[in-house]
């Protein structure tokens, strides 16, 4: 089995599972940002979020939501950071959502890269129009 997350799902790769059901498997990240950093993966191999069938999105993200609540309740975290990469910066080509426990003054910035305003309102309007066109039925 080439996909390490498929191997975790299959039980052939060891992992500290925290959730395992018919939709998803959630397990501790081996290199966590903080203790309790969890990866949530769909049971079926899907490389990215856009590869997840629409009917599976809701059930999958209900599991992500449960894990986010668990890091707060079970670990006493003040909140969580929830994120997924699609292709760029995606270390394993199997959809995975990071749920990272957060606390005030934990040293992690909300975004890990510089943020910049649009140079002109017209630039923002053009980007918004391109996205609306891509979202049109």
Feature roles, as predicted:
Residues 1-137:
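HIT superfamily nucleotide-processing domains
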């Amino acid at each position: 089995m080439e996909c390490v997350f498929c191997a975790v799902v299959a039980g052939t790769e060891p992992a500290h599972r925290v959730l395992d059901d018919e939709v998803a498997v959630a397990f501790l990240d081996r290199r966590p940002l903080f203790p309790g950093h969890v990866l949530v993966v769909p049971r079926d191999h899907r490389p990215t979020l856009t590869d997840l069938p629409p009917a599976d999105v809701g059930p999958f993200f209900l599991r992500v939501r449960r894990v986010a609540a668990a890091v707060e309740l079970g670990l006493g975290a003040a909140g969580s950071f929830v994120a997924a990469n699609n292709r760029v910066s995606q270390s394993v080509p199997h959809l995975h959502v990071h749920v990272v426990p957060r606390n005030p003054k934990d040293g992690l910035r909300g975004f890990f890269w510089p943020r910049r305003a649009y140079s002109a309102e017209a630039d923002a309007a053009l980007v918004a129009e391109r996205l609306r066109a891509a979202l049109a039925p």
